[in-house]
A protein has these predicted regions:
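Active-site oxyanion-binding pockets that recognize sulfate/phosphate
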Residues: 9, 16, 117-120
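A conserved amphipathic terminal alpha-helix motif
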Residues: 114-157
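Conserved catalytic core of Hanks-type protein kinase domains
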Residues: 29-30, 71
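Short acidic N-proximal helix/loop "leader" segments that mark the beginning
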Residues: 1-14
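Short beta-edge strand/loop motif at the mouth of beta-sheet-based domains
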Residues: 14-15, 21, 25, 32-67, ...
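Hydrophobic-ligand binding "helix-grip"
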Residues: 37, 44-46, 50, 59-107, ...
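Short, flexible helix/strand-to-coil boundary loops that buttress conserved ligand/catalytic motifs
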Residues: 30, 40, 81, 138
């Protein structure tokens, strides 16, 4: 069973989801380009090591870019985040993902900090859209075609 919880603070989005998959499997969905595009993006270039750069075409029109800041295999990933075009520039915000074993699954805790105003609202919507897709893909399912790749992206991104 997949369960979700969420909260928003002054400058951060916090989401928690329990996924029926091991931390090792879920880690791969953040570090392997072929796995990433199953839940987020149309193409991805990832160099998952501290100082390594990533570039993900998230919607077919909007490209996220940043740098991996910390990698602890199967436990924690921290990376900078921003958009190649738009008010939230690459490196201006930070995403932290924690993978915590939980019985036969994993508790995924995500914190995206450094956001404000419309950018905060847009990223709340973004993570609410993408984390359920991650849950399906990591558990071995098919989240289907991402509707965000077929139309205009949400405002503020």
């Amino acid at each position: 069973m997949t369960t979700f919880s969420s909260s928003t603070f002054d400058d951060a989005v916090m989401r928690e989801v329990r996924i029926e998959a091991s931390p090792e499997v879920i880690f791969g969905f953040f570090t392997d380009p072929e796995k990433m595009i199953k839940w987020k993006g149309t193409e991805a270039m990832l160099d998952p090591r501290p100082g390594g750069v990533y570039r993900v075409n998230v919607t077919g029109r909007e490209v996220a870019r940043g740098e991996y800041l910390e990698i602890t295999p199967y436990t924690r990933i921290v990376f900078s985040w921003g958009w190649e075009e738009g008010p939230i520039t690459p490196g201006s915000t930070t995403v932290e993902v924690r993978l915590i074993p939980d019985g036969s699954g994993t508790l995924v805790q995500l914190r995206h900090a450094g956001l404000s105003g419309e950018g905060l609202d847009a990223h709340v919507a973004g993570w609410e859209h993408f984390l359920p897709r991650l849950a399906v893909a990591a558990a071995g399912g098919d989240p289907g075609v991402d509707p965000w790749t077929m139309g205009p992206p949400p405002d503020g991104q």
